[in-house]
A protein has these predicted regions:
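Membrane-embedded beta-barrel scaffold of Gram-negative outer-membrane proteins
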Residues: 266, 532, 540-544, 571-629, ...
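Short acidic/polar hinge/loop motifs at secondary-structure boundaries
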Residues: 66-68, 187-213
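Periplasmic-side early beta-strands and strand-to-turn transitions of outer-membrane beta-barrels
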Residues: 238, 246, 264-344
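A beta-strand signature from Gram-negative outer-membrane beta-barrel systems
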Residues: 100-101, 201-240
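Gram-negative outer-membrane beta-barrel transporters
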Residues: 593-602, 621-715
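Short, acidic, small-residue-rich periplasmic hinge/interaction motif at the N-terminus
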Residues: 35, 39, 49, 80-84, ...
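Face-selective signature of the C-terminal outer-membrane beta-barrel domain
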Residues: 312-329, 348-509, 514-535, 542-544, ...
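Extracytoplasmic beta-strand/coil segments of soluble accessory domains associated
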Residues: 131, 142, 147-188
Length: 783
């Protein structure tokens, strides 16, 4: 069993130091947001220039801008954006001054303007590819965690194996696991799956979630095939306090808090926060492998603590310098299915630290610099030393090994050590409003030192060895926009380089491990385009031929249950996406959106997790070729000022296209059969009623929410017969919530019910999932 394989990648980070130059004490900072006058939505890529100076900047993805000016004089700020009327604002400089601006749409676009930062080009790049964006409203309500939110997104499937802390896999259009890029604020999460999962990030701390399909934006770095999930955390005002606590069924408790404070004079922002998650996961489950016997889970406790601090400077030579330090500790019991496991557990402790540097106009007007360097240190291991095993009747059974062990055939007392250094450099040069180039370099050094003397003693030989892995991904991109922004195109060329140094055990002679060194280099490319026929209707198309470098776990193992696979080939893919998007702003400022996408993908040298001949061990192997094709449709909008509706559906067909059994000339018996354990038909729909001051008074808001999810039955083995019983039944679940805030969102109370009808739901190899969950959440917000 993979150690904490439910832990997915999250945000990684570092240790390093950097000296910087401070600016004159006479400098002042003007900052704020730029929004659309009609919709209130943030505007990306608005050019802001200070009159009679060379100072200029553009708004970021949240419509936020920051401008450093000298002196204490009165200046004119000029705001320009394609499709909007030019706006001029007069301000008197102070140490720190907020200036929020609303722009009015213009019938004629502005003439060509030189943009000197990468935000506008980032907007163009993201607009050209298929992407779903999940905002703050969807992050609250019935959702208790990020997986709940992602599961309602068109084309996305989240498969869990249990309750809180259980293993889960996120797939986009059928491609899942390590093929999906996982990012936090555009930073790849790399090897943190042993320590933390995206699902561990509290929804209160998230501004939005971006789900990219098919193509991963070049500025993210790293290698991914099926798409990417990017979690964008919140930008906080000068003073901010957020406290949330939720209690629910199965003895579940979740707590999170964030405190931020900014010194206006120095421009330093200090932050501290943390989360605490606890659940016994003691729900009843029906065991299909034991004649549908019902038992109560009694060894599935999960406990995780995360604490962090940060310091950010905004008045030094760099526009932004940020240092973060995070600590994580996890304890998780292992729940038995076939047998009643009573003692085995996983544990991990991890430290991550990061230094990030940002500077617009980096020694050259129009050149923007963004650099991150991170360091990760962690220890983890599975502990399974029980001298007895038990069946579900309480009968005592002897262990398979004389040294004990109940989870596997051999015991384990792992104490594995991981060291990782990650850095990412992004340089964006904007030539003019039509042309931009980007260079991205992502480097990852991973060093694993496994140790499990008890397992080695029981096996009679050493099964895992220290290993190292280096990866370097280089990307060069060109962005083009024409016809007053109606046509956008982004072309990216990437070079994937990796090397590893590990030892491989010959299954026929386990006493002589062989040292294996690997060095390989591959190229890939992608292109995405978008054309607007009208302000409301656009066509998107993209093509990619890319490579995914095997992760360190796949290539060099994990130190206790996964062996090294130095001969593993990278996965390669060729894919096409074509879609139409209709987005209409109603007279009452309500928004209607309808999007249709079709997609085709051919994945070669697919990597799969398979058992090994060595007892208790497994390794990753190349499976062959898989073809994916499908269609997805989503419609959502404001029916009236108080009612919002959404619905989406996905059909994804994954087929085995290997004509021959690997390594033989024998015909493949599963040729053109559907890939097992992957849902192929799914849909979601929901509604939200919202109204202010429904009970009288002022500063109050009430939301009633309903969500439903449908997944058609599918097989968890190849469908060789229509009567085959190895299938996961159709599931239809409903969630509901009531949310009421008062004091202008200072206090928010939420009552939520998940799986309203208490329907029996199974997933991932027929594993039973929790039944009805009832939770109550209170949140306090000071800003």
């Amino acid at each position: 069993m993979l150690l904490l394989n439910q832990k997915r990648e999250f945000y990684l980070t570092i240790l390093s130091f950097f000296f910087t130059l401070s600016v004159s004490a006479q400098q002042a900072v003007v900052y704020g947001t730029v929004t659309d006058f009609q919709t209130g939505e943030p505007l990306v890529g608005v050019l802001i220039k200070a009159d009679k100076t060379n100072a200029r900047t553009v708004t970021n993805n949240e419509g936020f801008y920051r401008l450093v000016l000298s002196g204490r004089q009165r200046v004119q700020l000029n705001f320009q954006c394609i499709g909007y009327k030019e706006h001029t604002q007069s301000v008197t400089l102070q140490d720190s001054l907020r200036c929020d601006v609303q722009l009015t749409s213009a019938e004629q676009v502005l003439k060509e303007v030189t943009v000197t930062a990468h935000s506008e080009m980032r907007k163009l790049k993201e607009a050209a590819m298929p992407v779903s964006v999940i905002g703050q409203q969807q992050l609250q309500g019935t959702a208790s965690n990020m997986n709940d939110v992602l599961a309602r997104t068109v084309g996305v499937t989240v498969r869990n194996t249990g309750g809180m802390g259980s293993a889960s896999r996120i797939s986009v259009r059928g491609l899942e696991g390590k093929r999906m890029g996982m990012f936090v604020d555009e930073t790849p999460l790399s090897q943190l799956n042993n320590f933390i999962a995206l699902n561990d990030i509290p929804t209160n701390m998230i501004e939005r979630i971006e789900v990219y399909k098919g193509i991963v934006p070049y500025k993210f770095g790293g290698s991914a095939l099926g798409g990417a999930v990017n979690v964008v955390t919140k930008e906080y005002p000068p003073v901010y306090l957020d406290f949330a606590y939720e209690a629910g069924s199965f003895n579940t408790h979740q707590f999170s808090t964030v405190f931020k404070r900014t010194n206006r004079k120095s421009g330093l922002q200090f932050g501290i926060g943390g989360t605490f998650s606890f659940s016994k996961n003691n729900y009843e489950m029906t065991l299909a492998n034991l004649d549908n016997r019902t038992v109560k889970r009694d060894h599935d406790l999960f406990n995780k603590v995360i604490g962090g601090m940060s310091v950010k400077a905004t008045k030094w030579w760099f526009d932004e310098i940020k240092w973060e330090l995070v600590f994580m500790k996890t304890y998780q019991e292992i729940q038995g299915i076939d047998l009643d496991i009573r003692e085995a557990y996983n544990r991990s402790v991890n430290y991550v630290t990061e230094l990030s540097l940002k500077r617009n106009n980096f020694f050259l007007d129009g050149l923007d610099f963004n650099f991150d360097i991170n360091y990760v240190f962690g220890k983890y291991g599975m502990h399974d030393k029980a001298m007895n095993r038990y069946d579900w009747d309480g009968n005592k059974l002897p262990p398979v090994s004389a040294y004990g062990g109940e989870q596997n055939n051999f015991p384990s007392d792992g104490n594995n050590r991981l060291n990782e250094l990650i850095s990412k450099l992004n340089l964006q040069y904007t030539i003019d409003m039509h042309h931009s180039v980007n260079f991205n370099a992502y480097f990852d050094h991973n060093s694993l030192h496994p140790k499990d003397t008890l397992m080695d003693k029981a096996l009679g030989f050493r099964s895992n060895f220290p290993s190292k892995m280096n990866t370097l991904t280089l990307g060069l991109s060109y962005d083009l926009t024409l016809f007053n922004g109606r046509f956008q195109n982004a072309f990216t060329l990437k070079n994937f380089i990796f090397s590893s140094d590990s030892r491989s055990i010959n299954v026929f002679s386990v006493t002589e491990p062989e040292r294996v060194k690997v060095f390989k280099s591959y190229f890939g490319f992608s292109n995405a385009a978008r054309y607007k026929f009208t302000p409301d209707l656009m066509l998107k198309a993209s093509f990619n031929a890319e490579v995914r470098i095997p992760s360190s776990e796949e290539l060099i193992g994990n130190g206790y249950s996964i062996l090294a696979s130095p001969a593993l080939k990278p996965e390669r893919t060729k894919g096409v996406n074509v879609g139409m998007l209709y987005r209409h702003l109603k007279a009452d400022n309500g928004l209607i959106e309808v999007e249709l996408n079709t997609f085709y993908n051919l994945l070669e040298d697919m990597i799969r997790f398979t058992p090994d001949m060595i007892p208790t061990m497994a390794r990753y192997r190349n499976f062959g070729s898989v073809r994916t094709q499908g269609i997805e449709l989503e419609a959502k909008g404001d029916v009236c000022p108080v009612l919002y509706l959404y619905a989406n559906g996905t059909f994804q067909d994954l087929r085995d296209v290997r004509k021959l059994t690997p390594g033989t000339v024998v015909e493949n018996p599963t040729y053109k059969m559907r890939i097992p354990n992957v849902p192929y038909l799914l849909g979601n729909f929901g509604a939200e009623f919202h109204k202010e001051n429904i009970f009288g008074g002022s500063g109050q808001n009430t939301r009633l929410l309903f969500d439903a999810s449908y997944i058609h039955q599918y097989f968890y083995d190849f469908e060789v017969s229509r009567y085959q019983e190895r299938k996961i039944p159709t599931s239809f679940t409903m969630d509901a919530a009531v949310e009421h805030s008062f004091g202008n969102d200072k206090w928010t109370l939420t009552l939520k019910v998940k799986n309203l009808t208490n329907r029996r739901v199974v997933s991932e190899l027929n594993r039973p999932l929790p039944g009805r969950y009832i939770g109550f959440k209170v949140r306090y917000l000071l800003r």
